[in-house]
Amino acid sequence: MATDIKKMISNLMEFYDFKNQTIITVGSGGGQFIEYGHVSKNVMAIDNDEIALQKLKENLVKSGLDSKFTLIHSDFYLTNLKADVVMFEFCLHEMKDPLAAIKHAQTMAPNILVTDHWPDSKWAYYVDEEEKVKKSWAAINSLKTKKVQEYDGLQLFNDYEEIYQKVKVQGENSIRRIAEFKDKKNITIPMSYGFALI
């Protein structure tokens, strides 16, 4: 599978100025977007998934950014840190109550940056997350935003087996939805995403 991560990072760096910022990241997982660490002051990465944090640590070492990041294995709601910005990395839709998550983040920083699937993203449909994504954007839109931007991206897969391996953890709905790709090669799925600054 491939997405144009470099383009997503470029869009993120244009959307928000991370220079000399203290950043709290939520759901930083495997560290796909760690490039902002090069210009930031420091980063506190919170994730409740130890395996994801281990992968992040490995990526930080490879990138030479390990000294700028503090990894925190915790439930986000149990943290009480201070920073310039709290960034949700494609995870707000996974929060049980997205509005409560944003409100908690607002106690930690004056700026809240959300990166997530766009509500009408085809990819969100295939991975059976469209309702969760709509709920998270409804929470975002219920608040005063400083700016919001939608982007178009693509998910690329060599064949059905590759897409199946990616979505099987999402459950039976996802597996049914990708059935249309059986026996197909070079599969392209639109993945619109957006950034919101609150």
Q: Residue spans of the language-model regions?
A:
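A short SAM/SAH-binding and catalytic strip from SAM-dependent methyltransferases
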Residues: 84-98
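Conserved alpha-helix/loop element of class I SAM-dependent methyltransferases that forms part
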Residues: 2-21, 32
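Class I SAM-dependent methyltransferase SAM/SAH-binding core
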Residues: 24-77
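A short, conserved alpha-helix within the catalytic core of class I
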Residues: 94-108
